[in-house]
Amino acid sequence: MENNGYKIHVAYGFHVNCYHSYRGDTNDAAGFGSDIRIIRGIIKTLDELNAAGIPVKGTWDSENFFSLEKILPAYAPDVLDGMRRRVKERGDENIIMGYSNGALGAMQEDELVSSVALAVTNPQGSGLKDLFGACEMIVRPQEVMFTPSQVKTYNKLGVKALCLYYSCVPFDAFKTLIPPLDDEKAYNPLTFEYRGEGLIVIPTYSNADVCDAGCLRAWVKELRKKQLDGTVKNDLFLFINMDADAIFWESLNLPVVKNRIANTDGIRGLVKEVADLEYVVFDTPGGYLRTHAPVGTIRFTQDTADGNFTGYASWAEKPYNRRIWTAIEKSRRAAKARENEEDFLNRLKLLSTTHFGLATPVLNIQREQTANELAEKLMDAAFLPEGPLTLYNASGTVLQCVQLRCKTAKALAVKGEGLEAYTVLPMGDDSVFLLLRFSEVKKEYVITAEETENAPCGDEAFFTLESAGTKLEFGADKRIRRFSINGQTVGGEEFLSSYLTYGGKRYDFSPDGMEIGWLTGGRYIKLFGGVGLPKAKRQGAYAFTFFTSDAVKGIFVLADVSYPYTPERDAISTENSSLGRYTDMRWQEAAPFCLSFENERPVSVIKRNFEGDISAFRVDSYAEADPKNRTLDSFNNQLTAGLIGLTDGRKGLLLGFSRSVLSSMACCPMRLTEGGRVKMNPFGTFDGRQRHHPNRSGDVVPRTYTLIAPQGKSLAPSYNGSRERALMCLTPFEGELPDEERMRELLAFADGAFATGTDTLLAPYNGENVWVQSAEKQTGKVRVRSPLFGGVKGNPVKYAFRGARALGYIVKKQRRAK
């Protein structure tokens, strides 16, 4: 084999974010102390390697507001000095993470633009150009959160490329979304295309991928062999990027073996393993892009994130997530009526992924307190009770939907200029939800209300709700029998299921009764009953109020679920995770309103992101990327800006939900079962087997990773003792999508109106629709167990066996690579 002149460029990326969901705000092991220690060590080691003649460079993607502006200047100015010096003297590179380590993929366009722009330069001087003099216009999104329509926004910003994981473990962005890439494409820039726009994507790898190859030297030699035999006809770029506080960057100093085993000597070992190979070039992403063009094109329409189940689960499926996200949505609605720079910046800060996850099943208490304070600021700013009761039109249509505080339990008559029809839905406390249709589109509507007689009612009993060809039929057994559109069945007797999985056993919600009645401007059928678990301190209850409206087509449902509360005795603090609280890890799944779609052909998921883009992806694409993913216990690659749904091309089901009542960035996980059937789990969470990722180690490393990764645990314990109230619209349709008018109405319901001012009976609602169980103060003798050995994800023998197999694999590959 001849030397063909091709090189392998290796880059090391350090993801600097000192603001964690699983640790607090102190300069010690319970806070950001380990970040500072490890980053100092990285800088020191890189300096030593350079002094020894090895021209290694670092690539830093750093969070600005919390880390560069607050924490590091106060507690570790030497770290900033070291980073600045290395940029100037050693060619280190800074790339963009985002101003407040925000959930970039779930941002509106204005939020994304500001997050990137402020990361480059800002008045506080914490921008990358402010601190380091320069930065590459390359974005490594926090948690690799990305939605395809943002290609256009990134292009407007002058962003050259995104770094997205193409990884062998669930800490990944797109490896399971597209057919496997050959090595020439997997280690080179690619062009991502979406609706006529293109943006470079750099496939990125983590320390888990290094272990999957055995060691970096084995990985590089394997790729070199393909260059020499002609399988690969190009230079290759291997970008290893991981959290800067990861222990893999520092020497583990293991007894006896003394760091002689690969992957135990931190950044020093990773560099020295390949420093003697003449075909290795130490580089940076920007450096490689300056001399290398994209070698291929990729396309996918899923939304990416690197959380549990390779998606958005970790930041979107906990009740607490929805509490914080709904405050963000209310702030967004308020901005339609009142622009305020301070509110906007507070919203950017609250959009930090750290206020939602990755911590599982709950956040660090201190982090939760900070998020609560920011959310309260946004809620207070959005509460404007002065003047007449006015609805600001956020949807640009004649349909206005809003939750309001109500001072009476009596029926209401609502008045307003041009008001043609309306429905009043009591929400079960001191609030109501109004659906109002006006005769023409205006920027704002003034309304008033007065008490009236109870809603008119008929004498007949009914077991069916109908609206514009949609029929929801109930049986005397207090269950749904059939859901259809113009005679086509969308769901049968299994259409709706409600259950918890606890301690390995399924517990279905217990129906107690069914209530039939009339609303002002509609009629309803309410199903209600109990939600029980064994030995619960407090049992739960549910009520699903299905109703129709004179103001708009569709069948709506108010879902109010109070979960049982079980004793919490499992500690969830570890060496790397200081959550400071207990939980009950026997909770495994929460499926309060699980919907089964009766498809006849392959299914596509319809979704809407927060830029307003509506797109779809085929669930078959998972199996096309990896046949082992023909079924998936859970997937959440679908952002939910008020809309989510399924279609088989002939018929479909859209679920709209009021974003200002209850929402999250991705509130509807799904399950793909045999035969291509999909279950939707709005405001719930699934558990089970993680998605399979193609890998080099015969699943040895990925299986070990999924066993020990704390974010891989179930999110269901976060539902313990909580209560949530959501308002949804069930919209079956024929064809691939509903007609434009129906879609416009559904989005108007989802986006809602923003209310200011006060009437004698009605006022803006500034309360909650999600209540989270307070952390229980432990007293007396408590049997505390680590969730690592709680039985939910295995036992110590399994951990030891898989760990030994992984270690043996690494040692074997290391020996062969000498």
Task: For the regions a language model picked out, list residue spans one by one.
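Conserved, mostly hydrophobic/aromatic
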Residues: 97, 139, 240, 284, ...
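Short, solvent-exposed loop/turn segments at secondary-structure junctions
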Residues: 17-19, 64-67, 100-104, 144-147, ...
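A conserved active-site cap/scaffold subdomain adjacent to cofactor or substrate pockets
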Residues: 234-257
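Catalytic alpha-helical scaffold of carbohydrate-active enzymes acting on polysaccharides/glycoconjugates
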Residues: 2-137, 144-201, 217-234, 268, ...
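Short glycine/threonine-rich loop-to-helix capping motif typified by GTGT followed
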Residues: 153, 252-256, 295
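A solvent-exposed, charged loop/short amphipathic helix patch at secondary-structure junctions
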Residues: 22-31, 251-262
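Terminal accessory/anchoring regions of large secretory-pathway or extracellular enzymes
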Residues: 258, 265-511, 518-520, 524, ...
